[in-house]
Design a protein with these regions (language model features):
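Active-site His/acidic residue clusters
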Residues: 1-32, 38, 69-70
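Structural motif
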Residues: 3-7, 55, 173, 204
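Short connector loops/turns at beta-strand edges and beta->alpha or beta->beta junctions
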Residues: 9-14, 179, 200, 206-210
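Extracytoplasmic/secreted cell-surface and envelope-processing proteins
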Residues: 14-17, 63-67, 117, 183-185, ...
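Secreted, luminal/periplasmic, and some membrane-associated catalytic domains
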Residues: 23, 34-180
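Soluble non-cytosolic domains of exported or imported proteins
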Residues: 23-30, 34, 118-123, 215-222, ...
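Substrate-binding rim/cap in mid-to-C-terminal beta-strand-loop elements of soluble/periplasmic
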Residues: 79-122, 190-232, 246-250
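Short, His- and charge-rich active-site/binding loops that engage polyanionic ligands
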Residues: 172, 176, 180-192, 196
Length: 250
């Protein structure tokens, strides 16, 4: 069997710029629907529909526009956050560039400076995480050590831990308040939170002899890969953690 992956990134960019409530997003989805129809018609002209399984989903949703309501929602000033956390660590441990970067809800500390001063990295991470919780717009702040050494079996902690990758994630991982997004030029909406508007997306499997039906229950996105492997009659990916969706077991 062959597997073709297509990523369509325009919806994210348009939603970020204009907001999910906008006529621009509505127009974009209308055009996207037409383009998908053209693609499927072309595909089915080459291959019989029963020989093709189409999976349509998204890796995330997006937040409501910060200025869509009568009162504007708070926005998170990442540059200011980085400066203030650095100032806090300077006050605690002396001058220096303690914070080297903040990107996509991840705060990165200066490990070289911490080690040169003979300080404990875990302690500094925990200090920064505790202080970050006082910042306006921050809902959760967890240290890298907590992510690696603790088990969060439910709630937002579990979602943050599932998104954590030790080689790339920051020393402190931040989750913002519901509806709060990072302040950026020309950005009205943003993805990357742990809330339902961001984590609930449609999942459509079509073709390949799959009977037509609507399933109302929630499923985990980690089930997509093993379900596809099952339908293609090939081994599951080695790092796969999900289970085959019961609706597709023969």
């Amino acid at each position: 069997p062959d597997l073709l992956n297509i990523c369509l990134d325009a919806p994210r960019r348009i939603a970020e710029s204009y907001g999910p409530e906008s006529i621009e997003v509505e127009d974009m989805y209308y055009r996207l629907d037409e383009e998908l129809a053209q693609f499927l018609n072309y595909l089915y002209a080459q291959i019989a529909p029963e020989e093709v399984v189409v999976v349509l989903t998204s890796d995330h949703g997006t937040s409501p526009s910060y200025d869509a309501g009568i009162v504007e929602r708070d926005r998170f000033n990442a540059a200011q956050f980085q400066v203030i956390v650095n100032s806090f660590l300077c006050a605690q441990h002396g001058p220096g560039e303690w914070v080297v970067d903040y990107e996509d809800n991840n705060l990165y500390l200066n490990h070289t400076l911490i080690y040169n001063k003979g300080l404990d990295l875990t302690a500094i991470q925990n200090e920064a995480a505790t202080f970050a919780m006082q910042f306006r717009g921050v809902s959760h702040a967890l240290s890298s050590t907590a992510m690696r050494s603790s088990y969060f079996g439910s709630g937002y902690g579990e979602k943050m831990q599932n998104s954590f990758y030790p080689r790339r994630s920051g020393d402190v991982v931040v989750n913002l308040m519901p509806g709060c997004i990072e302040e950026r030029p020309d950005v009205r909406s943003k993805s990357g939170s742990m809330y339902g508007y961001d984590t609930t997306v449609p999942l459509i499997l079509y073709g390949g002899g799959i009977p037509a039906r609507r399933v109302g229950r929630s499923v985990d996105m980690t089930s997509v890969a093993p379900t596809l492997a099952y339908l293609l009659d090939i081994p599951e990916p080695a790092a796969s953690e999900g289970t085959v969706l019961e609706e597709f077991r023969k």
